Curated annotation (Swiss-Prot):
GO terms for biological process: cell wall organization; peptidoglycan biosynthetic process; regulation of cell shape. This is D-alanine--D-alanine ligase. It catalyses: 2 D-alanine + ATP = D-alanyl-D-alanine + ADP + phosphate + H(+). Belongs to the D-alanine--D-alanine ligase family. It comes from Parasynechococcus marenigrum (strain WH8102). Mg(2+) 1 binds at residues 302, 316.
Length: 353
């Protein structure tokens, strides 16, 4: 007699700017949970978090997933409850393991992971510490530097350094003394290139800092480099393994949000055409990086590679990488011999480890 299926709570949507991407990622995860043997292994309960942080149960969540679009306010049941988390929706008390598919703040920064910890229920992906450190680029860079992993030169900044002319001038001089143009200004706690800008001169630097400061009080400015963009996927519980290495090529000046999520704007090469030594270095450093920040479960680790100088720099760790039909994480594992059916199963098997 076969055992009863495990009930998986797939949570998607969220308050971040990556809300729509989360819906698309959840579609892929839900598909994977219905493929092959997973049909017998798992029962899926969908939970949708709207842009105001309200949690909705399977009925509305199923409609959102089917349409692929967030509902209009007029389509939500009235009267609307107060924004934010007010308890689990009806129909979710049967969930045995949670599968968060939430990109950006509140999803991959340790927030929802902390909620699952308080509920004493297992969940897919990195824990509170690994999620929080990886999300904050300042904290992540400090941890990676402590592990001896090479990164491009960078300067950390605070939004309040732009509060008056004297402090702003001091910040600009600090950046210009440590970095050359072009450089990239990033909010420390957003993903999918949201809020990132490229500065070729001081005027653009000021504009980029002010833009990023509207989104995050913590900022990072990085040296621009002429390099290829490479990505490696990591999977596992207490023991991690790395996928083949992929490359992203794009027609834009840099890999911004529109380029990432618009069909035809970027091309992926899997596996990337690279020397064997570089491939092994990237795979090894991907696992080292996850260990440095305490990440288990899954991650996508991004690198820069200057083939003219044979130099590799670690860029960042994404603990809840995109899972859409054009996202690198599932494609890297597919090229490594792990199907979508196997991938979501392994991720669920690693939950709680």
């Amino acid at each position: 007699m076969s055992s009863s299926p495990t009930t998986v709570g797939v949570v998607f949507g969220g308050c971040s700017g990556e809300h729509d991407v989360s819906i698309r990622s959840a579609q892929t995860v839900a598909k994977g949970l219905t493929l092959g043997a997973n049909r017998e292994r798992y029962r899926v309960v969908l939970v949708y978090i709207d842009r105001d942080g309200r949690w909705w149960g399977p009925d509305l969540a199923g409609k959102v997933l089917s349409s692929g679009c967030p509902p209009a306010d007029s389509d939500l049941p009235q009267p609307l409850p107060a924004p934010g988390f007010r308890g689990l929706p009806a129909g979710t008390d049967v969930v045995a393991v949670w599968y968060p598919v939430l990109h950006g703040p509140n999803g991959e920064d340790g927030t929802i992971q902390g909620l699952f910890e308080l509920m004493q229920q297992p969940y897919v992906g990195a824990g509170v510490l690994g999620s929080a450190v990886s999300m904050d680029k300042q904290a992540m860079k400090a941890a990676l530097a402590g592990a001896g992993l090479a990164q491009v030169p960078y300067v950390c900044a605070q939004a309040d350094e732009l509060s008056d002319a004297a402090r702003q001038e001091a910040l600009l001089k600090r950046i210009e003394s440590g970095l050359c143009y072009p450089c990239f200004i990033k909010p420390a706690n957003l993903g999918s290139s949201v809020g990132i800008s490229k500065a070729r001169n001081r005027e653009e630097l000021i504009h980029g800092l002010r833009l990023a400061a509207t989104l995050d009080p913590r900022l990072v400015v990085e040296q621009g480099v002429q390099a290829r963009e490479l990505e490696c996927a990591v999977l596992g519980g207490t023991t991690l393994r790395a996928s083949v290495v992929g490359e992203v090529r794009f027609d834009a000046d840099w890999y911004d949000y529109e380029t990432k999520y618009t069909d035809g704007r970027s091309t992926t090469l899997i596996p990337a055409p690279l020397p064997d030594g570089i491939v092994e270095a990237i795979r090894s450093q991907s696992i080292q990086a996850c260990a440095a920040v305490g990440v288990t479960g899954m991650a996508r680790v991004d690198f820069f590679y200057d083939d003219s100088r044979d130099r590799v720099w670690l860029n960042e760790i994404n603990t809840l990488p995109g899972f859409t039909s054009q996202s690198m994480y599932p494609m890297l594992w597919e090229a490594s011999g792990v199907t979508l059916e196997q991938l979501v199963h392994e991720l669920l098997e690693s939950a709680g480890q």
